Amino acid sequence: MRERGWDVITVDINPDFEPDICTDITTFHYSGPVPDLIWASPPCIEFSKASLPASWACNRMPAEPDINLMLAAKRIIDDVKPRWWVIENVRGAVSWFIPILGPVRKKSGSRYLWGEFPIFDCDPGYGKWRLPPSRDRAAIRSMIPRQLSKALSIAVESSEER
């Protein structure tokens, strides 16, 4: 989106990602001009594991994933009232997000999008990343694929021209 000339403000609790605003969104209250778009991607690890069979050792976790970050993102969206908004996550989040966010609006590769945004086409050519274990694997996998953000930004720009 930055490549297309958008002003982008990033918010994250992890300073390693070098966000513009480093904070916990569960206590964050935005003040500033109303953005055209808010994109939230709560961590998907619990939801990714939730979609695996219970017998898998890596799936030994609480029965219910924590949806507090999604709820915080939705609270911010409701408070700020941008024209467009997206909350993105994985297939394992669907049953937890639908009661609050409504039906999935778009699926692109392994990513599921809820929100209010113009529908767009996007080649999910990025697929599931097969990355070896590493210290920054989770950070790399959490990045929004360039094709996806570009397709959405073009759709928003096109709808603004109408």
Protein language model features and the residues they cover:
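Class I S-adenosyl-L-methionine
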Residues: 12, 26-37, 44-162
